[in-house]
Amino acid sequence: MSDVNKKFDSKKDQLSGKAKEVEGKVTGDRAREAQGKTQSLMGKAKDKLADAEETVKGVVDEAKDKMKKKSDD
């Protein structure tokens, strides 16, 4: 899955979760509210994971470039 798709998926989970949470609050359905909070938190976790993956990819690519430059010299 591409970085953009991962970010989109995480935002979708956050938004859907928030909607379920609000629905649960309005209707008094505590289970639905909890389900929404959980989904929203999962979306936030996915977002942080996608950020970490991007950072690691950047560091690895930078290290590869440095190694390639050294081998070219």
From Swiss-Prot:
Pfam families: CsbD
Record's signal peptide: none
Domain of life: Bacteria
Compositional bias annotation for Basic and acidic residues: 1-35, 44-73
Disordered, as annotated region: 1-73
Matching InterPro entries: CsbD, YjbJ_sf
Family listed: Belongs to the UPF0337 (CsbD) family.
Protein name: UPF0337 protein lp_1708
Organism field: Lactiplantibacillus plantarum (strain ATCC BAA-793 / NCIMB 8826 / WCFS1)
Higher taxonomy: Bacteria, Bacillati, Bacillota, Bacilli, Lactobacillales
